[in-house]
Structures are given as structure tokens and as C-alpha cells.
Amino acid sequence: MILVKNQAGLRDLYELVSRSHIEFFGNRKPRIPKSLLNEKRKNLLIASSASAVFGNNGELANMFIRGSDLEDIEERAKFYDYIEIHPMTNYVDLEGTGDIESLDKIVEMNNYFYDLGKKLGKIVVATGDAHYLEEREAVNRSVLILGSGMGRRIFSYDKRLFFRTTEEMLEEFSYLGEDKAYEVVVENTHK
């Protein structure tokens, strides 16, 4: 996830997107090398991207789920300006495919990332990874993805990427405790 800080950052982001499609396109996806991202990061905010679902590559989340050494995860986390965590229901496909034994692994991961953010002095932000506004719109997204030939998603896994209210997000992160949930859902999203 890349956010812009200002107009110069927007110009830098446009350049990164253009170059990713022209110079670094591969395996049906545009890519931005970290070396190029480092050159342009002055006016950007770079997040860890918590997504490790449906073939997306959230670097830190993938490392944690695959059992990488925590020191390696910590070292990689230093690259990012802030750390994202997603609702555990966003990861039901990993449980359904056997990549994780239960959603308890996601609770463990999100708690670890919260503590890691504190240790490294990085903001931890809860994001919903919303791909559509209403929960009932999941079927529309699945039709688009499956019809485009880009995915082999099982529809039953793709029902929780809707835009959640603050109350719904606080409930999703209630396992962190009331104060921590409020911090990552409300306070840190405004910093």
C-alpha cells in the first residue's frame, strides 16, 4: 500500500505506476522494485500490506503465516512507514485451504504486529481491505474476478471484504482489548 503525502508524492506515485507497467511488468502484474520505491519514498507513505489472502503478497503477513524467523520479519518491517493489520475474517480462505489451522493464527499475527509496531516506533493501522461497499456486493466481485480469468477463488471465501463501519471494525479487533482496538481502528487512522 502506498499513500501520498502531498502533490509531489502524487507525481511520484504516477511515475511509479507508469514505470511498473512499462519497465517492470511480469507474470501478468506490474511491479515496483524496492530500490525504485526507496528513490521516491520522500513524499510517500509505504505500508506493510497485511493481505496474504487470495494470492496477494503482503510481505510481513506471508512471512508470519509461513513461519519465518521473527527477527527476519522485524528486519523487513523496518522498511515500512506503518504496519497494517486486517480483520481475521479476511483470512478465512487460509483456514479453508489448510494454510493455517485456525483463525487463532491471525489473532496471534495481529497481536505480534501490534507489539512489533510499538517496538519499532511504527504506527499500526487496522484496515478492512475493502473491495466493495456492501457485503451483498461480494457476488459481483466474484463474477468479475472469475470472469476475467484472473482468479480461481471459491465464492464462499470472498464475502468479507466490504466496507465496515467503525463499530464493525472495533468488533473485529476486540481480541486486542478495548484500548488497543480503539487505537488501531480510530486513533491511528487519523495520524
Give the role of each language-model region.
Residues 1-191:
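Phosphodiester-processing cores and adjacent nucleic acid-binding clamps
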